[in-house]
UniProtKB/Swiss-Prot annotation:
Biological-process GO terms, alphabetical: fatty acid metabolic process
PANTHER family named in the record: ACYL-COA SYNTHETASE, MEDIUM-CHAIN ACYL-COA LIGASE ACSF2, MITOCHONDRIAL
Catalytic activity: a medium-chain fatty acid + ATP + CoA = a medium-chain fatty acyl-CoA + AMP + diphosphate; octanoate + ATP + CoA = octanoyl-CoA + AMP + diphosphate
Subcellular location per the Swiss-Prot or TrEMBL entry: Mitochondrion
Presequence positions on this chain: 1-42
GO cellular component: mitochondrion
Role summary: Acyl-CoA synthases catalyze the initial reaction in fatty acid metabolism, by forming a thioester with CoA. Has some preference toward medium-chain substrates. Plays a role in adipocyte differentiation.
EC number(s) reported in the record: 6.2.1.2
Position of the signal peptide: none
Family to which the UniProt record says this protein belongs: Belongs to the ATP-dependent AMP-binding enzyme family.
Modified residues annotated as N6-succinyllysine in this record: 182, 478, 544, 570, 599
Name of the protein this chain belongs to: Medium-chain acyl-CoA ligase ACSF2, mitochondrial
MF-aspect GO terms: ATP binding; medium-chain fatty acid-CoA ligase activity
Amino acid sequence: MAVYVGMLRVARLCARSPRVLGARVGLSRVWQEARLWGVRPLSSGELDHTVPLPVGGFSYVQGHVGLHLSNKTVGRCLDATAQRVPDQEALVVHHENIRLTFAQLKEEVDKAASGLLSIGLRKGDRLGMWGPNSYAWVLMQLATAQAGIILVSVNPAYQAMELEYALKKVGCKALVFPKQFKTQQYYNILKQICPEVEKAQPGALKSQRLPDLTTVISVDAHLPGTLLLDEVVAAGSQEQNLTRLRHTQQFLSCHDPINIQFTSGTTGSPKGATLSHYNIVNNANMIGQRLRLHQKTPEESRVVLPSPLYHCLGSVGGTMVSLMHGVTLILCSPVFEGKKTLEAISRERGCFLYGTPTMFVDVLNQPDFSSYDISTMRGGVIAGSPAPPELIRAIINKLNMKELVVAYGTTENSPVTFMNFTEDTVEQKAESVGRVMPHTEAQIVNTETGTLTELNTPGELCIRGYCVMLGYWGEPQKTEEAIGQDKWYRTGDIAMMDEQGFCKIVGRSKDMIIRGGENIYPAELEDFFHTHPQVQEVQVVGVKDDRMGEEICACIRLKEGEKTTAEEIKAFCKGKISHFKIPRYIVFVTNYPLTVSGKIQKFKLREQMEQHLNL
């Protein structure tokens, strides 16, 4: 393994003062890339295996810099891939019966980008994409980037109030959506906050509540006051509009904003994390490198994506990784369905599967699971929330996903900052979120003093590097609260780092329970309770207590048909976890309060439990 001189110098600095990294402004490129005399250069195949170890006995690590960062825009990356593998299948939309090669995808994207410019949108304007996974979603994602327009990822479950907040927050000039999906009638929801659309001239909307919104585009139906997406794309094929597109592209920079993604709002109103071409292109490239997609044949690298495109795991881990590495992306359904996911794997010969722990649980629990052909499966990515070790082992063994990796990140970090290598052991995958990604610094600091923690000691995880967002759109104060002057982004996650650089997420800083002076991390207890044979899901929160400050409350959802008691659960804990970690309260529940994106809102769960327990 290569050893970096810069890392050795940092180790000596850390040994003298754990605070030095908090004020450091960054290593020079020469310092970063210097190697000890006599250490041979690395081949391209070895680069991502060169993971520097934590230094000085402290929880700090810097990813290697052997892989060069790209200055290309998303559009230039699509151009390059279409030129390199024009006939390679790029996109399969299983539920729409659509198949496109990279050459065909580029042609359609160019026309759509040209069409958006032809209707008056310009570089820097914001366009909201509001709807479930579809061909139109991918088309808008890439076309906006090609034209310098900023894509705003709007949750397809948003109702009128949430939609109004999002569109006003970032000043959306255009909005694209299907007429409806299941019970979600998008046009009717828009009319609740923008009744003027029914009588508006298409492309000339004037709305009292949404003053920035001028253009509404319907994906699949002629609706009053809207343009039809097919007509916009058709207009883009005209030569004068393509000329305008080529002119616009001359002024695009990799550091321009490309995407605004709203954080989940588990602790308040959603914030618009703003990402650049530079953020997304490089993160996608490094995800694919660590998955070894660049070393696989087209038949070995077909990616099935049930994750929503409005999340970073879908848009970056899915669309952008496919684009960067020339692999086939398969969208299996508009929204996640376990059965549809298995159908896509079987029919499309899927090799890699991306998803959250909940998605994988549903796939594994399909009653006809054994009837599907999963022989082509090789690996995938699990991310989005903590995954119990038992689930990791089940995915690897039952889904034939020996190359499964766990990924960790945040929307604000584009998103992935830690990830396993495919060849890590099952234990390393089950007990950690892997090791730091290239060109990324990570440190864990004491939440009270801000100093570096020693190895294997919990603290707040902070990230610095190319991946950190440009900021929260229109909220400089919140941006400054999240990203310090030293450019460290504070994740709010409590983590530990071991001697090999493996990182374990143990909870959110706001979720940490302090019981009689003892720090207790809910994720640790949740992992433990998942070993109980009757427990399907569990969430642990702290509830107020006059004597101890906080007490532990375990909110348990049992497997279907199972019954047990609080006393039996507590008996299960004895002798297996410390006595002060045994919950005082055990509450059996059937569901949890969720955000619209499906994340559990622990602050609401805490409120519900305190009310339920009359505290």
